[in-house]
Amino acid sequence: MRTIRFNNNRHISSSPLLRTEGGREASVSNTSGDKIPKGKFSFLLLFFLLFLGSCSSDFLDNKPTDAVDSGLVPVPSNAERIFNGAWYNLFEYGTTYANIGYRALMCLDDMMADDVVSRPMYGFNSSYQFNDVVMPSDGRTTFAWYLMYKTIDNCNTAISIQATGDDDTPEFRHAQGQALAVRAFCYLHLAQHYQFTYLKDKNALCVPLYTEPTNPNTKPKGKATLEEIYTQIINDLNRAKGLLDGYVRPNDKSKYKPNTDVVNGLLARTYLLTGQWDEAAKAALEAAKGYTLMTDAKNYMGFNDISNTEWIWGHPQSVSQSDASYNFYYLDVVEPDSYNSFMADPHFKDTFTEGDIRLELFQWMREGYLGYRKFRIRSDQTGDIVIMRSAEMYLIAAESLARKGQLGEAVKPLNTLRNARGLADYDLTGKKQEQVIDEILMERRRELWGEGFGITDVLRTQRPVVRVALTEDEAAKEYDCWQQNGTYKKYHPEGHWFTSFPDGTKFVPNSIYYLYSIPEKETNANTNLK
């Protein structure tokens, strides 16, 4: 493993009353599970100027300077740099080795759901046991909250800039459109994690809604309803779509910058969550255009390259800027120095059909765990991060059409994906609507394993987490398990070992254990949240 260095790690509260600063310039060894030193809490003024000055306009090509440029002001010529700073925060900000950027939250969300078995190692064991983000005092709870609101505030700064005359350039409009898309992305995350699904109760209170940059005089807000938040998300995305019209990303390394395909993908996710089936299917199919599906299992093995033809949106990594790559140490089951935390439920493998190219990814390994060799860190210890790809869009279109009752149309995008994975068309003969929807949802689980959709799909579909322990007969079997020195050793299989909530009760739909909590330091600072 490598030593990583966290730069400018400042917590930014959604409440202007609370500003905490910790971990700046903390160099640590990654051979232990110790938390990065946090330093003292302090009030920050003009925090977006302080943070954003560290991000150069050639972000993701060269390592950002550690210098703080207090002269970076919110003017049109700085809009792109401000967006880049927001993006850098979203994916590179970290508080511990297991909390580095948005990819850590994606790991958390899958560990809380059905199909990942936690190998008891450093990382996400507490997530598997529903024992971190549900607790207001937990460090990961704090990390998740501030990661989103700091990014939102930085986006608000870029969005608030006014330009006229010669300052109103295409580059400025594109930067604002990208900031709007990322703000919508952040609020979509918050809406899915801090309240039950929109289709359960759109009037339920969720989180504060800030659309202007905060300052020490900003009045803390209370919770907005889900309907208010989703209305803002859709408005932001429609504005972004207009501003990004005609924008073309120059190369794959620029895939972190939203274009209209990304915006359509975010609209598809949003419409799916709000039950707008026609709009969801239309936006999803539009987003998928031009992103060719993989047809070879080798393209899955690694899943670390932003040039993958399926990837619509991703976060590239380089040797000089790669803190986010540390998340691969939890997902990679082959790398000898990895934690190998994410293993597959053996029952999950049983849902795959012979001929499916994804079956090649499974391998019994380690102490009897079933590895799923989807994610590999590269030899230079980096790995690009996928955020959105065309396979997800085909699944959104299929599910939306099926929920509308158009089963014949629904299986068309489903079969497009199945055929690419080596499978025949889904047989619709005699199938009822519920059966088709269930098959599409199962295909989502097979296709998107490890990509951060686990617990949000549980919440969206209002079902319980399902974890089934191995039976006596299943556990008595022996398998030749691959060892990281290249040899094989016989072990009994390992499956789910945590199959109820921490209080001993059974998994149920719409449980508070599936939701993130607001940090207690936030509710203490902003009494409007109580």
PLM regions with names:
Residues A67-L72, Y97-S118, Q195-N203, V207, ...:
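Short, surface-exposed recognition loops and adjoining beta-strand edges that mediate ligand/DNA contacts
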Residues E279-A391, L423-A424, I437-E439, E447, ...:
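Hydrophobic-face positions in mid-chain alpha helices that act as interaction patches
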Residues C55-M106, F352, Y426, G430, ...:
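Membrane-proximal, proline-rich intrinsically disordered regions
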Residues M121-Y194, A224, G242-D245, D380-I385, ...:
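Conserved, well-structured interaction surfaces
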Residues L18-G22, D34, G39:
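Glycine-biased, low-complexity coil/linker segments
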